[in-house]
Amino acid sequence: MSQTREDSVYLAKLAEQAERYEEMVENMKAVASSGQELSVEERNLLSVAYKNVIGARRASWRIVSSIEQKEESKEKSEHQVELIRSYRSKIETELTKISDDILSVLDSHLIPSATTGESKVFYYKMKGDYHRYLAEFSSGDAREKATNSSLEAYKTASEIATTELPPTHPIRLGLALNFSVFYYEIQNSPDKACHLAKQAFDDAIAELDTLSEESYKDSTLIMQLLRDNLTLWTSDISESGQEDQQQQQQQQQQQQQQQQQAPAEQTQGEPTK
């Protein structure tokens, strides 16, 4: 018996409850590849599925990279460092496969079938996110390519969001949150990151009284994350200005901080209501 679209969505929900996210991905990928535009619920299920699958690997990569840094500073640990690097490479292969998978679905099916401004922003934001994840661990030409692709997708999403979504819309706020993380972590541009986050926060504050009751919780949650990142980043900028003589040491500390305590970002695409 062939599996219907409704069956795939139901099985994806079942897989989510069972925390079997790889199967959730497969079911939602089947829905996404149908050529029909996804509903808001289907869109969120797809986002949750891929974010759980890749989120576990991103967390693993940060932990292993942190251990690698510590071992590199020790004497007589060359063999252990080689083992760690091989293990990190295995995780990076998995990260690449997952990212390439969803990026292919986005380019082949989801973006071409999107008809509303909301869905276009959602998918271009996703495209920016997954290229950013590739840039997190890549180097050389691969990092440059992933960085440029992420920037282009985020810019496209921002242009559409500015004209078609209000400043308080959860998807527009989530885009600003993740785009600012891109500037801070990938492009090492704290000034751009702070400017973008502050602008999004201020624009939303100015129209807070227009928020509907159903969107209020989602929007204010993301606004809090924007403010949390601004607090973290502005303190980093202040410290760097006061400690120019210890610049090299501070850069190492910042790298460790990024691996162990990353800035807040929107991890589930559009919050479910």
From Swiss-Prot:
Cited SMART domains: 14_3_3
Localization annotation: Cytoplasm; Nucleus
UniProt keyword Metal-binding present: no
Superkingdom of source: Eukaryota
UniProt keyword Acetylation, yes or no: yes
Comp. bias regions, Polar residues: 262-273
Ranges for region Disordered: 236-273
SUPFAM superfamilies in alphabetical order: 14-3-3 protein
Gene3D superfamilies from the UniProt entry: 14-3-3 domain (1.20.190.20)
Molecular function via GO: DNA replication origin binding; phosphoserine residue binding
PROSITE patterns tied to this protein: 1433_1, 1433_2
Residue numbers of N-acetylserine PTMs: 2
Annotated signal sequence range: none
UniProt-listed GO biological process terms: ascospore formation; chitin biosynthetic process; DNA damage checkpoint signaling; DNA replication initiation; mitotic cell cycle; negative regulation of apoptotic process; negative regulation of protein ubiquitination; pre-replicative complex assembly involved in nuclear cell cycle DNA replication
Predominant localisation class: cytoplasm
InterPro entries from the UniProt entry: 14-3-3, 14-3-3_CS, 14-3-3_dom_sf, 14-3-3_domain
Subunit structure comment from the entry: Interacts with NTH1 (via N-terminus when phosphorylated by PKA); the interaction is direct and activates NTH1. Interacts with FIN1.
Leftover remarks: Present with 47600 molecules/cell in log phase SD medium.
Family to which this protein belongs: Belongs to the 14-3-3 family.
Name the record gives this protein: Protein BMH2
Gene: BMH2
